Amino acid sequence: MAVDGSVTLELKNISKYFGSVVANKGVDLTLHKGEILALLGENGSGKTTLMNMISGIYYPDEGQIFVNGREVSIASPQDAFRYKIGMVHQHFKLIDLFTAAQNIVLGIKGRYNIKRINEEVKDIADRYGFAIDPKKKIYDMSVSEKQTVEIIKVLYRGADILILDEPTAVLTPQETEKLFSVMRAMKADGKSIIIITHKLREVMEISDRVAVLRKGEYIGCVNT
């Protein structure tokens, strides 16, 4: 069950077209504070396109987005972060020669105190149970460690709403269980999480509710 009944994110009648292709059509969706919501659908169902509109990669052609009851316009990832929304994509955007901490603050304006940043990254890791060395170079990391850096990156920027796009696709079963443990810790801390997946077993294990998309349209949502 969700920690809090308040709606933190709401989509109303969201549509997106690419020429004659309908990616999403009239989608309604709600996410509550402290909830893990699974977004389920086959490949090409519009899951990632929908989440890309929430995270500022695409802009909806129709519909409204509300964050904490307020209508917002999200035209860029910077806008999304302004509303405390962060998305972790399947393909990581990290610089191999940089450390975890350097990647996490990359793009943030201002001077860096790397010692302080290392400490802040470690604090976030300890808070949610991540296993990561802030000083470790990306080229020395496993795939799961790289994913951890991407998740901490959005948490460092203050995200309260996290979108994870097929996060288990690159993980072993043991790494998946560790990720789910971290997700439960974030949920307990009041974070709201959307996990994009097509794996029903994982939906039943980790989510509070599951919303189903098919051919770009919202089919329904049920408690899990």
Regions found by a protein language model. Give the residues of each.
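Glycine-rich phosphate-binding loops of nucleotide-dependent enzymes
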Residues: A2-T224
